[in-house]
């Protein structure tokens, strides 16, 4: 920025580093300088891409300052297709943190889904919103739709089992975990979760011990298992 102060990209890089260092006022000043220079770029694609990154950094600064409405407003300015989905998901998260969960869900639902993968990403983002808001029953039901789109995905099924537990459906959780183990005998997280849920209930304690030992056998160094 000192050697070539009229080039926009170094200002954007400097702002990025300043945000990482929590030098927010300095980052904001760098972004203002970048924006002034970027708006003069003749290439529309380069200008748009640069401004998108600047808006994302502005949103990050506002979020660090707990100004969630301001952060959401910056994200709303992004219309770059490459960044649109991620930006809208962040917007939805900020709306939910402000107690506007229904608005957040509507925003996710309004996103275009040109492919089945897009639809899965939308549902996954909405499930995460509900999980963060502790709306476990709704999250569990929506996760069921996600599983239906990819019924052979054991990771999705495991997440559904965990949400079933949060929503108070202990028997469903057990059924789903046993289904995963039957389909993928080395899925150690399922052994661990099922073992501990049985132990917590004080039932089938011998099976619970065997399940946990099996989990450790498959993943001896997994800190999640050794800590649980």
Task: Place the predicted regions along the sequence by residue.
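Alpha-solenoid helical repeat scaffolds
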Residues: 1-228
């Amino acid at each position: 920025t000192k050697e070539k102060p009229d080039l926009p990209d170094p200002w954007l890089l400097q702002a990025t580093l300043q945000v990482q260092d929590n030098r927010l006022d300095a980052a904001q000043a760098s972004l203002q300088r970048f924006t002034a220079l970027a708006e003069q770029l003749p290439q529309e694609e380069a200008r748009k891409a640069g401004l998108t990154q600047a808006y994302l950094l502005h949103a990050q600064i506002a979020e660090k300052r707990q100004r969630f409405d301001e952060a959401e407003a910056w994200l709303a300015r992004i219309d770059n297709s490459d960044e649109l989905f991620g930006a809208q998901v962040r917007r939805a998260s900020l709306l939910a943190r402000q107690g506007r969960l229904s608005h957040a869900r509507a925003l996710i639902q309004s996103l275009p889904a040109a492919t089945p993968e897009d639809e899965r990403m939308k549902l996954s983002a909405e499930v995460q919103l509900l999980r963060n808001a502790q709306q476990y029953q709704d999250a569990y039901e929506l996760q069921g739709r996600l599983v239906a789109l990819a019924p052979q995905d054991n990771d999705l099924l495991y997440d559904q089992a965990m949400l079933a537990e949060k929503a108070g459906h202990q028997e469903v959780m057990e059924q789903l975990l046993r289904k995963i183990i039957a389909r993928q005998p080395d899925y150690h997280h399922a052994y661990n979760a099922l073992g501990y849920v049985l132990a917590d209930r004080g039932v089938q304690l011998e099976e619970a011990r065997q399940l946990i030992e099996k989990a450790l056998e498959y993943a001896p160094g997994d800190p999640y298992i050794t800590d649980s």
